[in-house]
Every structure is written in C-alpha cells, then in structure tokens.
Amino acid sequence: MSLSTLLSLVDELQEPRSPIYELGLGLHPHSRYVLPLGTQQRRSINGCPCASPICPSSPAGQVLALRREMANRNDIHWPATAHVGKDGFQVCMDVAQFKPSELNVKVVDDSILVEGKHEERQDDHGHIMRHFVRRYKVPDGYKAEQVVSQLSSDGVLTVSIPKPQAVEDKSKERIIQIQQVGPAHLNVKANESEVKGKENGAPNGKDK
C-alpha cells in the first residue's frame, strides 16, 4: 500500500459520520445531535474528487458500505445502549427502517420491551424482512408506570423514565384543630347541681 493511500485511509477514518446506520442500533442520547458532514468538500490525496465525508471508492468507503450491507441482515444483533443521567433513564435507537405502526413498546414486570417488525418487502437488493426485540431492565427506584416513548421524524425512537423525586423524611406529626365552643362554666355548674341532688336523695319519680 502506497503512502498516499495510507494517509488517505487515516484521514477518512477520522471524518465524522452519522451514527444512524444500523438496524435497531442503540444510541447515546447525545448522539442524536451529531450530524454528518455530507455537504462539506474534503481534500483528497489520491486524486478522487468526492464531496461525501468518505469516498465510496476508497478503502474506508468500501468498509463502510460493507457495514451498511451487514446491518440489513436479520442475524446481526447490535449492542443496546441505556443511559441514566440527571434527567432520568433514557434509551435511544435507530428504527428508521420501520413505520410507526410496526413498532411496539411495552412494560412487562420490571422490564421494557421494544419490538420492531415488518413483513417481507422489496428493496434495492431484493426482498427483506426485519425483526428485532430489545429488553431493558427498569433501574431500581424508577417507576415502570412512568415509561414514555417518542419517535422522531428522522426515525429515532426514545424510551425514557423521569428521575424519581427525592422522598422527604416526614415525621408522624398531626396538627389538632382547636374548636371554639360556648362558655365552659355553665356546663360545669349544671353538672354540680345534678350530683348534689342525687346525694340528698331527691326522688327521681312520682310519690305514691
């Protein structure tokens, strides 16, 4: 391999690229905001005037094309990525190959299941059927009933759980409301009169 070809390969491998290529690939939440340099004109050492970040005819471009081709196979399983940060639990994945009606997100016990499936359809290389299932465990302290999911217009599915609120240590204290009533001395005098009457043997009924 010549020196110019080697330098070209190193230069091209350092170019940023979009992370949204593979089927159901787990993405870090911040990766959604990384955009490719698709329109930036790059220099070429080997004389290939290519406007894309990685020239398709270069060795790096051929490797990238092979990786994309492998991503369309059903037997490829990419590692899932879950992120727990200050905003809570979050999972992002590329599902651009699926329609919204072909995606399903559900909670089973303490796990989140994400499934995508479409029947056999024709593409540029023939017919293909895609299907993937991913399972994520709900972190300790998080509530499974608060799981929400969003699908962006560019095909990124985000499943998240808000961060649990801190539980305040409240003592078992209860404020008793004071009720305002009439004068208390009237009730006391009435009770004393009844007691004295019983001590003197006052008849309770009629004399015969």
From Swiss-Prot:
Entry's Gene Ontology molecular function annotations: myosin binding; unfolded protein binding
Q: Which Gene Ontology CC terms are recorded?
A: cytoplasm; cytosol; nucleus
Under PROSITE patterns, the record lists: SHSP
Phosphoserine PTM positions: 44, 52, 58
Return the SUPFAM superfamilies for the record.
HSP20-like chaperones (SSF49764)
**Spans annotated as Disordered:** 187-208
UniProt keywords, alphabetically: Phosphoprotein, Stress response
UniProt xrefs under InterPro entries = A-crystallin/Hsp20_dom (IPR002068), Alpha-crystallin/sHSP_animal (IPR001436), HSP20-like_chaperone (IPR008978)
Where does this protein have compositionally biased stretches of type Basic and acidic residues? Answer: 191-208
Question: What's the superkingdom here?
Answer: Eukaryota
Look up the record and give one Gene Ontology term from the biological process aspect. chaperone-mediated protein folding
Q: Taking every annotated instance into account, which residue ranges of this chain make up the domain sHSP? A: 71-179
The family note in this entry says: Belongs to the small heat shock protein (HSP20) family.
The entry's protein name is Heat shock protein 26
Biological classification of the source:
Eukaryota, Metazoa, Ecdysozoa, Arthropoda, Hexapoda
